[in-house]
Each structure stands twice: as C-alpha cells, then as structure tokens.
Amino acid sequence: FNKIIARKYFPSRLNNTRQKAFSKFLDIGLPTKKWENWRYTDLSFLTKNNFRISEANDTSENIDFSKYKIKNTHTLVIINGHYAEHLSDAPKELKVLTNYEYLEQKDWKQKDKKDTPFDLLNTSLCDSGISFIIEPDTVIDKPIHILFICSGSENLIISPQVNIDINRSSSATVIEQYASESQTRSNDQTNR
C-alpha cells in the first residue's frame, strides 16, 4: 500500500481517503463463504498466489487487440489498467484525462459509495484508469468502447477506475469489455 501512495498517480490530498479505505479493508477482510452473497464464490486464489501491483510500464506492445475490437465504435484501450493512447481512437468531442488530471479538477466523490472489500481495495490501491468528459450539448455519434486488456506472464493485480462525466443535454453509449490473456486479476470501478 505504501508503494502505491508513493507513486503519486493521484493528488496527495486524496491519500487520507485512500488510507482510511485500506484500514477499513484490513478490518473487514476478504469475503468468506459465511457471507451470504459470497457463499458460492471461491476466492482462494487470492490468498494462494502472490500478486504484484501493475505499473505504467506494464503495457505490452505485442498484444493483438484487433480480435476484441467492435466495429463502428470509438475504442479506448486500457492495458493492465493503463490507458494506451496510441492504440485508441477517441472521438474529438471526448476530453480524455488521466485520473490524476481529472481529480486535480474534481472532488473525489464516489457515487453509490459502498464499503465492500473490493470497493475499499479499489479506492486504496487504484493507481490507473481513465477519465473522460463529454461537454454540454454534445452527442457522440458512435458508441465508446472501453477495452480493458490484461496481459503478461506475471500475476498482476489491477485496480483501475473509470470516471465518466456526461454533461447536460449530452449523450453517449459506453461499452466496457474485459479480456484477459494472463493470470492478472482486475478490480475495476466505474463512476458515472
């Protein structure tokens, strides 16, 4: 956790929020089969394996993402939690920001904030993702396809956040797709 905070992927004013989320996660722990909503879910792989938190340089150039591309969409590619601008075709009406840039402009208010273990982990360990803003009175002509690809030979844990601001009298269709070619575990959160 301390390594994540030291990376400075987020404004330092958010460190207190992240530390509180991590402390609360440590108190709650991972769900067990005794939890009603988790009684049929095997999470033992989380404790049986070692995971490394993804870094910005974990974006492989050797991924054939064309098999995941959806025709007639604007595709935003995120590899191992990090936005790959050079592989993306964002429409000109879309203002794409890093989460750092976005959170410098906005207050970090999680919509429908939940204190579940995976939400708390995402809040505390998030160091990647993408944010985009659609200005007022804007219509995006084709769906926005957010393609999350997990790849690599290492066991990575990825906790990206996607922040979407669609302003008044604007419209867009957003499709999120997840593809994994590795043992990577993703704990994504989308805020609209």
Q: Where is each model-derived feature located?
A:
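Glycine-rich and polybasic anion-binding loops at the starts of cofactor/ligand-binding domains
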Residues: F1-R192
